[in-house]
A protein has these predicted regions:
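Short acidic-hydrophobic, aromatic-tinged amphipathic segments that line or gate anion-handling sites
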Residues: 242-250
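Nucleotide-sugar donor-binding catalytic core of glycosyltransferases
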Residues: 1-216, 220, 224-243, 255-282
């Protein structure tokens, strides 16, 4: 299985744009051209047809990111192009629709989509990048291949602080406590993946951003994630088995009755990166 990750979205692009400090967390693949948004002269840039940009450049509140002038620089591109935005926790919000006023932008494929537009296509955060311990895709594939029996019902363990966590995770955590779910121990990555694989369902609220690695870890292991309804989860629930929760205070275990047994995994092949890219016609 060619597991989806942020690096892979970057690597299929012909050119990548970010700030120098972003590169530590991005792909180390040197096959494509990397451009420093603060140093490169974008005037009449003879751009390729597929461009990656670090999605933190969308940020409208941090002075250092605003000063980079991301949108103004995209306006200088000479040729039509599709834009892939990934590799940060920042979301694509209603305000970012002004990007579609740039004549040369055809489609935007973005992580953490928080609005809708006919030319805006959500793409998965997938699993973590290879620089992280929890981005060991070879090990994750080995657990997938082992097909560990699902003997437990709902996995319950996550951090509450940081990013989107502070808004939604306390409500999800309170639901887990109210339902008397056994809270799993925090484990090292490899032990965690093997433990997670034993479950049919998993409480999976938002992460640092709107999307979350946990949801995708679940889907790869054929666990049905239980997620708060938002633009991202609602979109991917059309492709994969995901339980959408509108109100954590109203969620109950009986909502899961028959769900795992009737889960439709017919699109599981789309969890392969190459298949997903073909599905999107990138």
């Amino acid at each position: 299985m060619n597991i989806i990750s942020g690096e892979k979205w970057q690597d299929i692009c012909h050119v990548g744009i970010s700030k120098k400090e972003h590169t530590t967390f991005e792909s180390s693949n040197t096959d494509s051209l990397w451009l420093d948004i603060d140093e490169f002269d974008f005037e009449f840039f003879n751009n390729p047809s597929l461009v990656y940009a670090n999605s933190s450049l969308l940020n409208r509140f941090k002075p250092k990111l605003i000063e980079s002038g991301f949108i103004d620089k995209l306006k200088k591109f000479k040729n039509p192009f599709d834009l892939i935005l990934h590799q940060s926790d920042d979301s694509f919000d209603e305000a970012h629709k002004i990007l579609f006023d740039i004549p040369n932008i055809k489609k935007i494929y973005s992580q953490n989509v928080n609005t809708t537009h006919e030319r805006l296509i959500p793409i998965p955060i997938g699993l973590a990048n290879s620089r992280w311990e929890w981005g060991d895709l070879d090990y994750f594939n080995s657990v997938i291949s082992n097909d560990i029996p699902k003997t437990e019902l709902v996995y319950f363990n996550f951090e509450i602080i940081g990013g989107q966590r502070k808004y939604w995770r306390p409500l999800c955590y309170a639901a887990g406590v109210r339902l008397n779910l056994n809270e799993s121990k925090r484990l090292k990555f490899k032990e965690y993946v093997k433990d997670l694989a034993r479950y049919k369902f998993c409480l999976s609220p938002e992460g640092n951003g709107i999307d979350c690695h946990r949801m995708w870890e679940c889907l790869y292991l054929k666990i049905v994630p239980i997620c708060h309804r938002n633009v991202v989860t609602e979109h991917f629930a059309k492709l994969f088995p995901i339980v959408l929760v509108d109100d954590w205070n109203a969620f109950k275990l009986s909502d899961l009755d028959g769900v795992y047994e009737s889960a439709d995994w017919s699109n599981y092949n789309l969890l392969d990166f190459d298949n997903f890219a073909k599905y999107l016609e990138i």
